[in-house]
Amino acid sequence: HASARGEGFLLLKADCNKGYVTVKQIGVNPTSVDLVDVGKDEEVKMRPGQVLHIVNKLYPFVVQFGEESEESVMEAEEKIQTEKRPCEDSCENDDIENVPKKAKKMEVVDTQSSSADLRPSKSSVSPHEGTTSRKEHLGHWSQGLKSSMQDPKVQVYKDEKTVVIKDKYPKARYHWLVLPWDSISSLKSVTREHLGLLEHMHAVGQKMIQQCPAKESLEFRLGYHAIPSMSQLHLHVISQDFDSPALKTKKHWNSFTTEYFLNSEEVIEMVRSKGKVTVNDQASELLKLPLRCHLCKQQLSTIPQLKEHLKKHWTK
């Protein structure tokens, strides 16, 4: 933003990997982040969830990080383009490292003109107060797994090697993510030296199943997505009922019910024998397969039809 004389000029620099925008006030007109003045020639870091006011608190903005990709695994286009769900599919949407064919996108959202569903921070004053929504997602989840795993509010188990969090958008009644504390971007980075860690992650996943109150009536699978849509290695522990409103697309379904979902034990054996994990280059094509029931293999035309069909298996 800049006035004719440069009085309200700001310099914004986005660091997409770290999930913040550096705000530097060049002009003299007051600029604030969460109502704290930046100061002329000073700079602060603004993260998703904070509100930037330009020129005497007249123009509030928030920042949103998303991703764009022709082959985005988990509906990245849907996340960016829809107002209602900016952070779909396990909120696997940011902090992406070394993932090919993906570009980061930073949006500065004018909270007055385009986002009537944004909730302001507690310290800000806005006519939209009381509405739910996007802003809540822009807190820690929009910054990716690396920040989420550090948040005690979402941790359900932790030890010296791993932490378990509930999937923000669970695709079944029970859906956890087991993550290592060590920074490991994906299965591509795994070597034989990580074998013990993978075995430990699997054991932690089994522990989550054992403490589940529905363990006697539900089947579970432990595994990894062939092409993860966010960085930081994570093991899915998911019940096989797939009874969840967050399961909305064919890609969601196929990512857990085709060979796109790599069984944890098979990954461990691959690392043990080959020293690395190899993934089929055409794995993304699996997401386009027709919808089939994972239990009886009946083909269904739509997600609503599939969900109705699944209910037949629950009662057996």
From Swiss-Prot:
It catalyses: a 5'-end adenosine-5'-diphospho-5'-2'-deoxyribonucleoside-DNA + H2O = a 5'-end 5'-phospho-2'-deoxyribonucleoside-DNA + AMP + 2 H(+); a 5'-end adenosine-5'-diphospho-5'-ribonucleoside-2'-deoxyribonucleotide-DNA + H2O = a 5'-end 5'-phospho-ribonucleoside-2'-deoxyribonucleotide-DNA + AMP + 2 H(+); a 3'-end 2'-deoxyribonucleotide-3'-diphospho-5'-guanosine-DNA + H2O = a 3'-end 2'-deoxyribonucleotide 3'-phosphate-DNA + GMP + 2 H(+). The active site is at H234. One of its GO terms (cellular component) is nucleolus. Pfam families: DcpS_C, FHA_2, zf-C2HE. Residues 104-142 are annotated as: Disordered. It is an enzyme of class 3 (hydrolase). SUPFAM superfamilies: HIT-like, SMAD/FHA domain. Residues 167-171, 229-230 are annotated as: Interaction with DNA substrate. One of its GO terms (biological process) is single strand break repair. It is found in: Nucleus, Nucleoplasm; Nucleus, Nucleolus. The record marks S148, H225, H236, K251 as: Interaction with DNA substrate. Residues 1-38 form the FHA-like domain. A zinc finger (C2H2-type) spans 291-313. CDD domains: aprataxin_related (cd01278). Its EC number is 3.6.1.71, 3.6.1.72. A motif (Histidine triad motif) lies at residues 232-236. Residues 110-130 have a biased composition (Polar residues). Residues 142-247 form the HIT domain. GO terms for molecular function: DNA 5'-adenosine monophosphate hydrolase activity; DNA-3'-diphospho-5'-guanosine diphosphatase; double-stranded RNA binding; mismatched DNA binding; single-strand break-containing DNA binding; single-stranded DNA binding; zinc ion binding. The histidine triad, also called HIT motif, forms part of the binding loop for the alpha-phosphate of purine mononucleotide. The HIT domain is required for enzymatic activity. DNA-binding protein involved in single-strand DNA break repair, double-strand DNA break repair and base excision repair. Resolves abortive DNA ligation intermediates formed either at base excision sites, or when DNA ligases attempt to repair non-ligatable breaks induced by reactive oxygen species. Catalyzes the release of adenylate groups covalently linked to 5'-phosphate termini, resulting in the production of 5'-phosphate termini that can be efficiently rejoined. This is Aprataxin. The gene is APTX.
